[in-house]
């Protein structure tokens, strides 16, 4: 199977998000890469499901709370930008202050 660099990035992001979901389910606080991966993967899945950019920008702030991440992580993540594939093409989704 041949994967493009973009497909490899998506697969790596999915794997990191899956790990983050498992750790969160165990009650563990997420670190920076896990938090960003989880938010990014949720946005990409929402785009694939046909949700709008505006919906995803809003939903992106509801995925994680400060209690879900290690100390200082929420202050480090000012925005998350994801290039997601929508039914009508690829668009950039930016979520400002995603961890509240």
Swiss-Prot record:
Bilayer-spanning residue ranges: none
One GO location term (cellular component): cytoplasm
The keyword rRNA-binding belongs to this UniProt entry's keyword annotation: no
Compartments (UniProt record): Cytoplasm
Pathway(s) where this gene product acts: Nitrogen metabolism; urea degradation; CO(2) and NH(3) from urea (urease route): step 1/1
Pfam families per record: Urease_gamma
SUPFAM superfamilies linked to this entry: Urease, gamma-subunit
PANTHER family (alphabetical): UREASE
Family, per entry: Belongs to the urease gamma subunit family.
Protein name: Urease subunit gamma
Source organism: Marinobacter nauticus (strain ATCC 700491 / DSM 11845 / VT8) (Marinobacter aquaeolei)
